Regions:
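Disordered, low-complexity "stalk" and linker segments at domain junctions of extracellular
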Residues: 1-13
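A structural/positional concept
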Residues: 10, 17, 41-43
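A short helix->beta-strand "capping" segment at the edge of beta-propeller domains
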Residues: 1-2, 31-42
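Blade/loop signatures of beta-propeller domains
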Residues: 14-33, 69-70
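Beta-sheet-dominated scaffold domains
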Residues: 14, 43-194
Length: 194
């Protein structure tokens, strides 16, 4: 792979996908050492981060988001979604509920294969309040279909917990984690606090 490649994610079909600048690098299936130049895909805007879900990869950029789909690296297709909802934090990208959730300037967005891009926080929090949490600082995790966003707005650190169940809501916690790991086998979220 190129020396500058970062953000490696793995699709369900064994294709590794990384990026550098505005170039996407797919690998040969199950060969994460082989990234032929002929598979490269370019985006209009610089890539912020990636998120894999099913046979798809979410591409968060500084402009429009994209979705890459396909079963073979030679026939991957990339779709530019029409909404200008930039990804403001690569650490906000979380796979959950059959898609990818990420922080945009306007709120949390979800990308799924069936519904495309939709806002999860419209009606829950207005843009000014959202911006007061500095979404570009988010370090986020999922547990039991809840989205945990640890934030630092320069004066306050904390955690926003979004529950997108039957009655969507969110609340704040007075804890701040610098890192975390979702241990699926134990159904637990381990956090580095302090």
């Amino acid at each position: 792979p190129p020396d500058t490649m970062q953000g490696l994610v793995l699709m369900a079909n064994g294709i590794g996908v990384g990026f550098s600048g505005n170039t996407i690098y797919p690998s040969e299936p199950f060969a994460l050492y082989a990234y032929p130049l002929k598979y490269q895909i370019s985006t209009e805007y610089p890539v912020v981060g990636l998120g894999a879900f099913g046979q798809s990869v979410f591409v968060g950029t500084t402009g429009n988001p994209y979705v890459i789909q396909g079963s073979d690296p030679g026939s991957l297709t990339m779709t530019k979604l029409p909404q200008k909802q930039a990804c403001v934090s690569k650490r906000s990208i979380v796979e959950m509920n059959g898609g990818v959730v990420y922080a945009s300037p306007d709120g949390l967005m979800q990308v799924t294969e069936s519904n495309g891009l939709s806002s999860l926080t419209a009606g829950l929090i207005n843009r000014d309040d959202w911006q007061s949490f500095n979404p570009s600082s988010f370090s986020s995790f999922e547990l039991d279909s809840r989205y945990y966003a640890f934030y630092d707005n320069g004066t306050t650190q904390g955690c926003l917990v979004f529950d997108f169940g039957a009655k969507p809501n969110f609340h704040k916690l007075d804890i701040y984690a610098t890192a975390g790991y979702n241990e699926r086998r134990k159904d637990a979220l381990f956090l580095a606090i302090g």
